[in-house]
């Protein structure tokens, strides 16, 4: 018990330290641009607009980090309201991946979608599942750039439904696979840094899946195939 508490305390201290650093960095940049705008009232309009655009981007980045922190806090405290219902997985998966189709086509990705014709129902929260799939697809787009292939596969067995999100990008070395879902895992190339750059992305994804009574798994062979699999309970109708 004391050992687990000590590990949790160390993890929390590390998370607070990293969040403080991640907040300080964009805020310092924002303050720098504001100073420049303040000290140079005669600045050209196009240069002023460029700087204001950067201020906006950094402000959104900071806001995203704060949202991540509070989302994770809610999930881990059990305060997140998450009504569970039957989800038509075919529809949810199809709508989510198709929303990325233009981006993927523009970046030259080959997209593989395998969704069966027969209805497959899972038990979960549609909003949470939507966020999980968005997170994983965004992750694959960012880190699968090398292989230029991305796929979504929906499948089932007698008791569960499975969604595989895969890519052929740089992947994750075996020594890091067990750690990528940890809070604030800060390996330079870790995929846990993809979500708003906060180091909380895959942790939030995992907590959302677990809050729906499911599980998430990862297997990866760098530059060949990386697969995140979301498993939820199957609903028989």
Where are these regions (language model features)?
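Short conserved segment of the HATPase_c
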Residues: 172-184
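Short helix-loop "hinge" at the ATP-lid/N-box region of the Bergerat-fold HATPase_c
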Residues: 140-141
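Short beta-strand/loop element within the Bergerat-fold HATPase_c
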Residues: 147-159
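Acidic ATP/Mg2+-coordinating residue in the GHKL
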Residues: 167
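Conserved catalytic submotifs in the C-terminal HATPase_c
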Residues: 85-86, 110-120
